[in-house]
Design a protein with these regions (language model features):
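Small-residue-rich anion-binding loops in enzyme active sites
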Residues: 320-336, 448-468
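Rossmann-like dinucleotide/flavin-binding elements
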Residues: 376-403, 445-453, 457, 465-474, ...
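Flanking helices and flexible, charged tails adjoining ferredoxin-like Fe-S electron-transfer domains
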Residues: 200, 364-373, 383, 396, ...
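Flavin-dependent oxidoreductase catalytic cores
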Residues: 1-381, 385, 390-396, 400-401, ...
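Short connector loops at secondary-structure junctions
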Residues: 64, 215, 250-255, 405-420, ...
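Helix-enriched interaction subdomains in cytosolic or periplasmic regions
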Residues: 337-351, 458-473
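N-terminal Rossmann-like dinucleotide/flavin-binding domain of flavoprotein oxidoreductases
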Residues: 412-458, 570-596
């Protein structure tokens, strides 16, 4: 029985047919610019095509050097570059898939000094100021887009996606906030949208009639001075007339201060926006953002919100997502949790994309899964992220794996993380591992403390025993009002109304989010999420912003977060999500103070020095989030007994809780042992 009839229905485009309603959305992987990038991209995309993706869209490639994402970024403007691309397109076609090249001119977001834009207005997220394009330069850029599309066809691509949203060049022409021209390319909306329309028209003319053209259209800019819904409809109709095959609806500029793809955003939070465009155009519409589950995708399409869904990061998490769904194995899907830690955050520091829950993503050629030649009996101590990743991957290769944990359930630190408001997706990772333990035949032993003697009979021992909270040397640290984050998050210790949190790392922020949450998290309610973040669901306001702005509720507790370092609190949080946590906590009234020296804790509260001045924080509880210590008690006795011992996860490096590193370490060891 097909549980997802709408999702797996074919889509007739006239000159070609897509086998289902799933578009793999564009993601920059960091491989586009690497010497071995073509071969690695080919393996990455081919694996997704093999498992049923109807149409893949590549990471953004600039039509001209002025539009690269960063200095040295990918460009397609010359026939000499075609062999690189043919490696990718041939690999996808061998697996029965279709692939489109995203043509992306980043405009004023280009992180290099020779950037261009409609007007010389610097982006708030870029240190470079763009050059304002002349009339002749605009015409040349239109030709660059058309040439890029023609080259894409020659390289074997089935189509292109013209990136017209997210605040990039085409979007900058459309919005009054970034287009302050008074010539034929600016002024009223008819002139501001001319560049977008001329680009699509030129692409269609050069690429031919039987070539897919997707236009990525911004439905909600989520910035002041952004577009209106009437303008969006006008543009969509003009883009269709100019030759677009599909319209893919985008949400939010990169400089917008409203979360659109991170874990706290509800699933399919913006499909209602796409639905508003249904009936206004006749080409298929694609909706996107936080669609990470086949049932969510099925519901979006079956209720008529869109004709297709775009899923990008979910295919990092699981290349087999669609084949598992279609074959009745949806419970085996490794679900994207929207954390961004191994994908977007990696890209922003110049590294290759991967995935927290699937470290093989974009590293398929370097991390092949092959049957074990020498099958071993392996003991894994600790069923946290590192231990789980090792156990299921090693067992899938044919090793006999026994997984021990002293607690009554698997998960380790993930069982704590999933309780943080907005991190409910972490339940999915634990569901996945529970199922894969069954599928791969891992022998799971819960509520079992093990000694070195219990492990002597195994060929090798993998210690993934995790961490213990570090106790800082502060006078009065054993006072009854002192709690660790485990006391609060795991053991549900009662916490008073006035709280000091020592430590502003990830655990400190998680604890503050947990204690400051008033009622249910809006991550499970689209309407409440939109109100909380000031999104205008009536689409009556420019930019899609409510006039009253965000309505983030206040914390029921008085919370102050403290750290020894003088740097900005939360500096080590992810680039794409850290600002969300900071903004949320500050809006709730949580205070953050760096540069603190801790003197003592007593009945009166926490005594500190701030800026060299003594202060007394009269709090009910002091919560310790001041780092971790590795738990490796078994390592030495096992080695003394002659056993081969591997340390992974927090028991190897415990400076900060890092699920990305833990799962990657466990997976790599499992694939090599």
């Amino acid at each position: 029985m097909n549980r997802y009839p709408s999702l797996f229905a074919p889509l007739d485009l006239g000159f070609t047919t897509l086998k289902n309603r799933v578009l793999m959305g564009s993601m920059h992987t960091g491989l586009e610019e690497r010497p071995d990038g073509a071969e690695r991209l080919a393996a990455f995309y081919a694996e997704r095509a093999r498992h049923g993706v109807a149409l893949i869209v590549t990471g953004g490639v600039a039509p001209a050097p002025s539009g690269v994402t960063m200095e040295g970024g990918a460009v397609l403007n010359d026939a000499s570059q075609l062999p690189h691309h043919r490696i990718v397109t041939d690999a996808v076609h061998r697996e029965g898939g279709k692939i489109a090249l995203q043509i992306l001119h980043t405009g004023r977001y280009s992180y290099q000094p020779n950037l261009v834009a409609p007007s010389a207005i610097q982006a708030p997220i870029n240190r470079f100021t763009p050059h304002a394009l002349s009339h002749d330069e605009i015409l040349a850029l239109i030709d660059d887009f058309a040439r890029c599309a023609a080259l894409a066809r020659e390289a074997g691509y089935d189509g292109v996606e013209v990136m017209g949203s997210e605040g990039y060049l085409i979007n900058e022409f459309l919005a009054a906030r970034t287009n302050q021209r008074d010539d034929e390319w600016g002024g009223d909306y008819g002139r501001r949208m001319r560049f977008a329309v001329e680009v699509v028209r030129a692409v269609r003319e050069r690429a031919g009639a039987d070539f897919i053209i997707i236009f990525r259209l911004s439905m909600l800019d989520l910035v002041e001075g952004g577009g209106t819904f009437d303008e969006t409809v006008q543009l969509a109709q003009a883009i269709e007339a100019a030759g677009a095959t599909i319209i893919n609806t985008g949400i939010g500029w990169h400089e917008a201060r409203i979360p659109t793809i991170a874990t706290p955003v509800p699933r399919a939070a913006f499909s209602w926006v796409t639905r508003k465009l249904k009936g206004k155009v006749s080409v298929p519409l694609v909706t996107t953002n936080r669609i990470n589950d086949p049932q969510v995708a099925e519901d979006v399409i079956s209720r008529g919100d869109a004709d297709m869904v775009s899923m990008a990061r979910p295919f990092l998490a699981d290349a087999e997502l669609l084949s598992k769904a279609q074959s009745g194995r949806a419970d085996e899907i490794n679900t994207c949790i929207g954390c961004n830690q191994a994908c977007l955050d990696q890209i922003f520091v110049g590294k290759v994309t991967s995935c927290l829950v699937n470290p093989r993503a974009c590293h398929e050629t370097k991390m092949p899964i092959v049957p074990a030649v020498n099958k071993k009996r392996l003991a894994v101590v600790g069923a946290g992220p590192a231990g789980l990743a090792f156990a299921v991957n090693a067992a899938s290769r044919g090793h006999s794996v026994t997984l021990f944990d002293a607690l009554a359930e698997i998960g380790g630190q993930f069982t704590i993380a999933r309780q943080i408001p907005g991190k409910e997706e972490f339940y999915e990772t634990l569901r996945y591992y529970r199922r894969m333990i069954e599928v791969t035949g891992v022998d799971l032993r819960l509520k079992q403390f093990v000694s070195a003697a219990d492990l002597i009979g195994f060929d090798e021992v993998i210690l993934a025993s995790g961490i213990a909270p570090r106790t800082p040397a502060i006078e009065g640290i054993d006072h009854p009002k002192v709690l660790s984050y485990l006391d609060v998050l795991r053991d549900k210790a009662p916490v008073g109304e006035k709280v000091a949190i020592i430590g502003c790392g990830g655990i400190g922020f998680d604890t503050a989010m947990y204690l400051s949450q008033p009622g249910e998290a809006t991550s499970q309610n689209i309407a409440e999420f939109c109100v909380e973040w000031g999104i205008d669901t009536s689409l009556s306001q420019s930019g899609g912003l409510r006039p009253e702005g965000p309505q983030l509720p206040k914390s029921p507790r008085q919370i102050v977060m403290l750290q020894r370092k003088a740097s900005k609190p939360g500096e080590g949080l992810g680039k794409t999500t850290g600002w969300i946590h900071r903004a949320t906590l500050l809006s709730r009234g949580v205070k953050m103070i760096p540069g603190v020296s801790y003197q003592k804790i007593d009945d009166d509260g926490l005594h500190v020095l701030i800026g060299g001045e003594p202060q007394l924080l009269r709090v009910d509880h002091v919560i310790l989030c001041a780092g971790q210590e590795p738990k490796r008690d078994l390592a030495d006795p096992l080695r003394e007994a002659g056993k081969t011992v591997h340390l992974i996860g927090g028991c190897d490096v415990a400076m900060e809780l890092d699920a990305r590193q833990a799962i990657a370490q466990g997976t790599k060891l499992a694939l090599s042992i």
